[in-house]
Each structure stands twice: as C-alpha cells, then as structure tokens.
A protein has these predicted regions:
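Pre-Walker A (Motif I) flank of P-loop NTPase domains
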Residues: 2-6
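P-loop (Walker A) phosphate-binding loop of NTP-binding proteins
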Residues: 12
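Hydrophobic positions on the alpha1 helix immediately C-terminal to the Walker A/P-loop
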Residues: 20
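NTP-dependent small-molecule kinase module
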Residues: 25, 144-214
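A glycine- and Lys/Arg-enriched "phosphate-lid" helix/loop adjacent to the NTP-binding pocket
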Residues: 104-172
Length: 214
C-alpha cells in the first residue's frame, strides 16, 4: 500500500486556512473517489498539550493563574502537541494510505515563537525528525485584511496572539522561514488576499502538480 501524502496549510490568523481546508478535502475526493482524506489541525483537541494550549490561547485561566509570556514555554507545548499528533494521528493515517490535510504544522511554531523572541534556526532544529510535508501551502496576506476577516468570524474566540504588531512579525517570519526551508522542502506561497474561489483554484493547481492530476 502506498503511503498517503501530507499536505499542510499555513498562515497568520485570518489567512483562510480553516476555509480552504474543507475545500481542499472536497477537491481531493472529487479528483479520485478512492482517496480517503483526513482533515486535522493544530493545536489538537486530543492531546493534553493541545488542550492546555487551547485553554491558554483563549485566556481561560484558572483562579490565580497568570498569563505566561515565555516563548520557550509556548514552543515546548506546541512541539509536544505536534509530536503527539504525528505519532497518534498523522503518521498512522499516512501509513494506511490516507491523504492528510493539516491546518497548521511546524512553520506555525517557527514563525510565532520566533516572533516572541526565540531563535528561528533553533526552532527549525527542534522539528528535525518529524515528518516533512509533501506540500506546504502558505497563505499570505496583509495583516489588516487578515484581522478584518478574523473580526467578522462570529464563531472565533479572541486569542492570546491577536495583536496587530505581533501578527506583522509573524507574517514576516513565515515568509523568512519559507525561504529558508524551501531549499529542501516543497513550500508554495499563495496570495490569500483574493476571493476564496481564486485561492482555491491556485491550491488545486498545486495539488494537480503534486499528484499528477490533469
């Protein structure tokens, strides 16, 4: 049995990863009805690390608990959750031939926690040994547009990293990290300031190249 492909969607908050993920899953199934596709995301809702991340990101602190602004604390939690995710969800699925679409992966931690002050190269090193995606789609757009979109999402909870200046740093770091890693990885930067259908078509073009679809 051939292994599935590992596809990752990345981008700052409001970039549209949660919109494009389901569209990509639908497209993969439409192109080949034999495709079994898993849409997953990080931080997870399954591991103790992911649950702790989600609690802290949304500011759901316990009485007397303080906000932690330590980039090492955050990066360790994210990487622990990612390692759990790979060992328990992503890896087993890929080995079964499932096509895995992951909303956020290593570029997220590399970009966010380097914006907090950790060395980017150190964060890259900490991810060595984890599966390398077959394709990473980095959805890039101006922070102003991303924040407008995020603000219109009534289902979205305001999070710890929701700050304009911080998101500007994260956006820059995403692009720097993509350039650093693209020598050894398949990373495509996509302009996600455009309408949803235009973004989806460009993603589909990259998927066609990856799978050899016509």
């Amino acid at each position: 049995m051939d292994e599935g492909k590992f596809i990752v969607l990345e981008g700052i908050d409001g970039a549209g990863t949660s919109t494009q993920g389901p569209l990509l899953v639908k497209y993969l199934f439409e192109k080949d009805k034999k495709n079994v596709v898993l849409l997953t995301r990080e931080p997870t809702k399954l591991s103790p690390y992911g649950l702790e991340l989600r609690r802290r990101l949304t500011g759901n602190l316990l009485p007397g608990e303080k906000i932690i602004d330590d980039p090492e604390y955050w990066s360790n939690l994210f990487i622990s959750d990612r390692t759990w995710h790979v060992h328990n969800v992503v890896g087993p699925a890929l080995r079964l031939g499932v096509q895995v679409v992951d909303d956020r992966y290593d570029l997220s931690t590399i970009s966010y926690q380097s914006a907090q002050g950790r060395e980017m190269d150190e964060l890259i090193q900490k991810h060595l040994g984890l599966p390398v995606p077959d394709l990473t789609l980095l959805l890039d757009l101006p922070v102003e547009i991303a924040m407008q979109r995020a603000g219109k999402d009534s289902q979205r909870t305001k999070e710890y990293f929701d700050d304009h200046a911080f998101q500007e740093k994260v956006r820059t770091n995403y692009l720097v990290a993509a350039q650093k890693l693209n020598k050894s990885r398949n990373i495509v930067v996509i302009d996600s300031s455009r309408p949803i259908d235009e973004i989806a078509k460009e993603i589909q073009h990259e998927i066609n190249k990856l799978y050899g679809y016509q």
